[in-house]
Amino acid sequence: MKYKIEKNTVQETLILPLYSRKLCTELYPNLYRDETAVRLLDQIDYDFSEAEKNSRSLMQRFGALEVAMRQNDLAFEVQAYLKTHPCAAVVNLGCGLDNTGRACDNGRCKIYNLDFPDVITLRQQLLPAGEREQNIPCDLKDPAWFDKIDAFGGAVFFASGVFYYFLTQQVRELVQGMADAFPGGVLVFDAANRTAVKMIAKTWLRTAKIKDVGAYFAVSDAKSELSPWDSRLQVSSRGYMLGYNDLKDPSVSGFFRFLARVGDNGMKMQIVKIGFGDRQ
């Protein structure tokens, strides 16, 4: 039996990123594989005709490459942390239907997937929690979720496409709270400069009726802008299109590599990594 998804619902907003990850898997098989996305889309009853039509456009295909690189970069950082903290908590902030935690599973870590209650309800149906895994309904801005994470063996948190929808002050409060609660932990997420955030915001600000885009979280120089938030933070960043992979694969055109450089350098599309130092 297929799970029906209606148009203009919260569930629909989760299906489209899933479709992007399936498209990445088809277009760039040497760079990215998301078998979960392919499998889940087979279980869903939804009219993909518009998405399929758009998938042939140049920018849609480049957007799929962006999604692939972002997921790969975040997975790289999670796996790097697990090498030195094999029993750590792996925490997917704003998980949607993303299965990166399970993809990084080393057989010993604990996996937590956090999102709003209606999202977690759908996730439980399509991606029920497995061994050493919990799907936790919460509001990321409310620190009540901190207590649900067993960080005894360390903790690595990652957020994909999440903080563009947070005010700068909200990200700052979250990071400071996490530094208190999870000393020795690491947070990795994607970010971009003000120009890029304005472009992202164009699509959703109209519906949200928000005037002040400038209040939303954007970063150009992560180390100099975020380090002053708290003396315990160890901040670094890498370009998210070319910072982890040179994209010299036959599936990626020279024009797309050029766009990738524009993204990393002009839009400051980056993966930010924040280490939480020990309590002072």
Label the predicted regions:
Residues 213-240:
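Short alpha-helix
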Residues 157-158:
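A conserved beta-strand element that flanks and buttresses the S-adenosyl-L-methionine
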Residues 232-258:
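Conserved catalytic loop of SAM-dependent methyltransferase domains
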Residues 181-194:
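Conserved beta-strand signature within the Rossmann-like core of class I S-adenosyl-L-methionine
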Residues 1-91, 95-138, 151-152:
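Rossmann-like AdoMet
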Residues 198-213:
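Short, glycine-/aromatic-enriched active-site segment of Class I SAM-dependent methyltransferases
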Residues 143-152:
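Short amphipathic alpha-helix with an adjacent loop that forms part of the alpha/beta core around
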Residues 165-178:
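A short, conserved alpha-helix within the catalytic core of class I
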